[in-house]
Amino acid sequence: MKKQAFGIGIQLVGIIGIGSLLSGCDFRMSVKDRTGETQEYTAESAAAPNTLPLEVVKYQQLNTYQIGKALYDMSEEQVDDYLQDQGKDPSFYLGVGTNGEGFYSINSELGDYYTTVLSTFSDDRTLDSYFSAVDIGDTSIDAIGAQIEQCLKDAGFLIAFCEKYALCAEGLNQLQKDLYDEEEFKLYAPGAEVDENGMQTGELNSWGEADEAYLFYYYMAYHNTYVASVSGRNRIQIVYSPSKHQVVYGNGNLCPILTQEVVSSKEITSLDENEAIALAKKALSEAGIKDARFVSAKPVYVNNFGDISFEDQTMTLVPAWRVEYTVEKNGKTIRNWLHLNAETGEVYDNTIKL
């Protein structure tokens, strides 16, 4: 069989995320009534409108052969041979899952370690607190990220932007110590000693240079506009090991291949940039976050699980504002954001607890 891209010896599993939706105020009121203030706050740039229409768009179903060709340069015969060698059901592996929504997942023998690490991050503990986008050894994080992004584009995915982190040993070990001090919880690092039940034993295991990896988050786009999901599962997550020269973990949820076929399109009356920032400021204040510094407000699309029709293979894209802000935490500047419905001001909360 032809060698796979990036030396990937992987299995692909279809996954889908369930969306959640929280709202923060009565959307029948005016902006002034809801915020309790006039629009005195001025954005860093002039107040701009959100001109995105509400659209219902067809998305494309990918099959296992398309994925195999686009990502791994495999013929249909090679895909069949691979699946037979692995003993896997083609409706679950190397493809898009049983419903054909365009979702997939990657895993390898190291995947569980990084899954455990990434599962520890939440509102109180952020990736920014431990990791940054630095090169590991002589391997460029930018070059690797660009190669993976090109593979995703070849498969038909539209990428809005990418976030990059280097999961370095120093940060991994600091996270390990913090978790153990707070919760007596040990991260599953490669090489850890375990008992007959699979539980770690002995001292805190140490992460070394061979365990270091790059983490990439690729966010979806439609016509070069970011598509956010209120469930937070609007991105493809990839972990790449420089020492092994291969992808070792990744998954994609709510990441369809959007087509150019528009089923319906509707213009809306949108809040402007300053109105969106004022509502975000109010929501954060009510959540106890009063020291936020607002960085930007950008027009985006929002989609949730209820806006996907698997029968018709359509997705409803709702115009929204993405308001980015920063807060100071433990001496570091942490970036976060809120999404608001561009027409009603409804707050979609997929990043913090309001």
PLM feature spans:
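Sec-dependent N-terminal signal peptides of Gram-positive bacterial secreted proteins and lipoproteins
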Residues: 2-29
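Short, solvent-exposed coil/turn segments at beta-strand boundaries
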Residues: 98-101, 109-112, 210, 239-247, ...
